[in-house]
UniProtKB/Swiss-Prot annotation:
Species the sequence originates in: Vibrio atlanticus (strain LGP32) (Vibrio splendidus (strain Mel32))
Domain of life where this protein originates: Bacteria
Gene Ontology BP annotations: translation
Cited PANTHER family: 50S RIBOSOMAL PROTEIN L21, LARGE RIBOSOMAL SUBUNIT PROTEIN BL21M
UniProt keyword terms in alphabetical order: Ribonucleoprotein, Ribosomal protein, RNA-binding, rRNA-binding
Protein name (Swiss-Prot/TrEMBL): Large ribosomal subunit protein bL21
Family under the similarity heading: Belongs to the bacterial ribosomal protein bL21 family.
A Pfam family matched in the record: Ribosomal_L21p
Annotated function: This protein binds to 23S rRNA in the presence of protein L20.
One GO location term (cellular component): cytoplasm
HAMAP family: Ribosomal_bL21
Subunit structure: Part of the 50S ribosomal subunit. Contacts protein L20.
Signal peptide: none
PROSITE patterns referenced in this protein's UniProt entry, alphabetically: RIBOSOMAL_L21 (PS01169)
Length: 103
């Protein structure tokens, strides 16, 4: 059984027991989170596709940890001008473990 849900402007395909990183959610570690923007639920041969959402569809997950991703370096370089600008960015994330999928 798997589902596709929307969170943080992105779509994620998940199954029970899977862990994944989402955009930072404002919840505590160990808390349970419910995602109700479910776009598709598949259970073997049965596939429920929403238009745009599956009615009664829900994905529940447990928050494992919060953290920051790897550093992304941004470089702006002006040729022949002896000018260079460097910056870095580390995006916050929330790691969740999928505990249930309901259709």
């Amino acid at each position: 059984m798997y589902a596709v849900f929307q969170s943080g402007g992105k779509q994620h395909r998940v199954s029970e027991g899977q862990t994944l990183r989402l955009e930072k959610l404002d919840v505590e570690t160990g808390a349970t989170v419910e995602f109700d923007k479910v776009l598709l639920v598949a259970n073997g041969e049965e596939i429920a596709v929403g238009a745009p959402l599956v009615e009664g569809g829900k994905v529940t997950a447990e928050v494992v940890q919060h953290g920051r991703g790897d550093k992304v370096k941004i470089v702006k370089f002006r040729r022949r001008k002896h000018s260079r600008k460097q910056a870095g960015h580390r995006q916050w994330f929330t790691e969740v473990k999928i505990t249930g999928i309901n259709a």
